[in-house]
Amino acid sequence: MTTTRLLASLILGVALILSSGSNVSAYHSYVISVQKLKAALEKAPDHLHKGFFLIDVRSPKEHAGGIIPGTDRNIEFTQLKTRHIEIGAQPKDHIVVYCQSGHRSNIAAETLADLGYKHVYNVSGSMNAWEAAGYELQPATR
């Protein structure tokens, strides 16, 4: 490949990345199934010692309708950039986020990853999948 073609390919690649409108992040989030989340919650000795933070990123109104047992906090996904410190997590800690369908929690997971958290998990299907699996909900505490 000639130097000119190589340079043209490089410029085109950078232009495509910049025009895509997406941020390039050094971190990324992962996906976890409701079955794996349920198993992790059942293995935990108690709510406070489960080894990860479980965050509901739905609206307070949705949160009030019931939560996944073991949920630590409700922070609406649109507020995570300014309120993430309330989670109490360090960048190396594991954070699991869920919403109603998985869309908002996917955005939340990427937001947290962009903020430097290295182990962020989005619950696939979120509350819809949790309820479809027949798992119980817990009343919200606040």
Predicted region positions:
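Rhodanese-like catalytic fold shared by cysteine-dependent sulfurtransferases
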Residues: 2-10, 16-52, 60-94, 103-142
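Short, surface-exposed ligand- or partner-binding patches at beta-edge/loop junctions that are enriched
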Residues: 98-99
